Amino acid sequence: MAGSENKARTMQGVVVSNGMDKSVVVMTNRYIKHPKYKKFVRKSTKVMAHDADNACGVGDRVTISECTPFSKRKTWSLVSIDEKAAL
């Protein structure tokens, strides 16, 4: 198909765990409007992402992209480390 582009979703989040080999857990936040009270509420989601170089540390702000599954729970891949955590 000529001109087809990769339309994979990307998200930004914070690394909350890096205790596994080549894997990190990234927490992302999103704001939704409560249907009854009309207040914006923060919802968080934790996803596992593939980190091939083990470059991420806890607290790093990263960008991840959806990809083909690496395992049962790991369907996201690390794109870039946007900001390193302050020590």
From Swiss-Prot:
Key words of the record: Ribonucleoprotein, Ribosomal protein, RNA-binding, rRNA-binding
Single GO MF descriptor: rRNA binding
Cross-referenced InterPro entries: NA-bd_OB-fold, Ribosomal_uS17, Ribosomal_uS17_bact/chlr
Domain of life: Bacteria
CDD domains in the cross-refs: Ribosomal_uS17
Pfam family membership, one: Ribosomal_S17
Cellular component, GO annotation: cytosolic small ribosomal subunit
UniProt GO BP: translation
Keyword hit for Ribosomal protein: yes
Classification via SUPFAM superfamilies: Nucleic acid-binding proteins
Subunit structure: Part of the 30S ribosomal subunit.
Family statement drawn from the similarity comment of this UniProt entry: Belongs to the universal ribosomal protein uS17 family.
Function noted in UniProt: One of the primary rRNA binding proteins, it binds specifically to the 5'-end of 16S ribosomal RNA.
HAMAP family linked: Ribosomal_uS17_B
Official protein name in the record: Small ribosomal subunit protein uS17
Originating organism: Hydrogenovibrio crunogenus (strain DSM 25203 / XCL-2) (Thiomicrospira crunogena)
Lineage, highest ranks first: Bacteria, Pseudomonadati, Pseudomonadota, Gammaproteobacteria, Thiotrichales
